[in-house]
Regions:
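Catalytic cores of nucleophile-dependent amide-cleaving enzymes
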Residues: 1-59, 65
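An often Trp-containing, charged/polar helix-loop segment at the C-terminal end
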Residues: 53-128
């Protein structure tokens, strides 16, 4: 597939302060996917789960046919930063997480994603 979205990808970054990997799990995954022909890859470095992750990736994939991957991602993050947050729909958010507000503007929800794109689709559109 030309576009791959892996919102549940597990990496060592998920363990936070525990001693983790050196990033090879991400690098080798990206190399394998790109060598198989993928042009756009979105993967998570830690799992957030929940409704916000679903909405974020849904918005990204809906916008991807209409704009470059970076613009589609920026738009989806902006929408989620202003979207209402329902803690009951977020399995990794507990009652003790008081610094989270009423919206999903905390970086926990969107900063853990890594977008890799060849830019080929955007270049082809500009040449026409």
């Amino acid at each position: 597939p030309q576009q791959v979205v892996l919102p549940g990808f597990h990496t060592a970054a998920e363990n936070g302060l525990k001693k983790g990997g050196n990033g090879n799990e991400i690098f080798l995954t990206l190399c394998g996917l790109m060598s198989s022909g993928s042009q756009t890859i979105l993967l998570s470095r830690w799992r957030t789960g929940g409704q916000t992750a679903y909405d974020l990736t849904r918005e990204f994939t809906q916008e991807l046919p209409h704009r470059p991957a970076s613009a589609a991602w920026q738009r989806s993050v902006q929408l989620m930063m202003h979207a209402p947050l329902d803690p009951e729909q977020e399995p990794r958010v507990g009652d003790q997480d008081t610094e989270l507000g009423a919206t999903a503007d905390h970086p926990f929800f969107w900063a853990g994603y890594l977008l890799v794109d060849t830019g080929d689709a955007a270049d082809a559109g500009e040449e026409k």
